[in-house]
Amino acid sequence: MECMAVNDISYGREAEIWPRDYSMLARRVQFLRFNDIPVRLVSNNARIIIGYIAKFNPRENLILASDKPKGNKRIEVKLESLAILEELSGNDAFNLSLVPTDEFNLQQYTPSRRDYFSICNKCYKQGVGIKIYMKYGQVLTGKTTGVNACQVGVRTSNGNHMQVMFDWVSRITSSDYAE
């Protein structure tokens, strides 16, 4: 049987830049850190940290998450392992939650090395929502707030803003897409 190439942009294209350039994400991380905004960090293996960004080293692509703003109890989060960075609003009720560094950074899946810029940009320009299928099984929906070569910004129905890293995505469609 002959193997067909998938030409559907919802499955992404081969990434032009590898390893990923996290400079745009780094700017957002610094903003969240300086403003003591609580975050939910989701790893590629669906581990979750809810807390604050205590420190950030852009040269090493490393976030140090803590249970307090600028706190001393720190968990290392490698950007290469990060699937979702969600900003939690001050109105959200949340329980602080930290997991061990080795559990969070464990790479259960191989990075896709896919670029979903085309589908995300198309949805952004048309003003339609997107539906994101994560490799670990979660499905996210929302409106895109912008996109670059390695991530897409999404505003969810509860108003929270998140950055979704393309390496842990299996497919992205518009929210009005029906199979």
UniProtKB/Swiss-Prot annotation:
Record's keyword terms, sorted: DNA-binding, Repressor, Transcription, Transcription regulation
Annotated protein name in UniProt: Repressor of phase 1 flagellin gene
The protein's gene is named fljA
Can you name one GO molecular function term for this protein?
Answer: DNA-binding transcription factor activity
InterPro entries the UniProt entry points to: Flag1_repressor
- Keyword Transcription included in the entry's annotation: yes
Tell me any Pfam family this protein matches. Answer: Flag1_repress
Q: Which organism is it from?
A: Salmonella abony
Quote the function comment for this protein.
Transcriptional repressor of the FliC phase-1 flagellin.
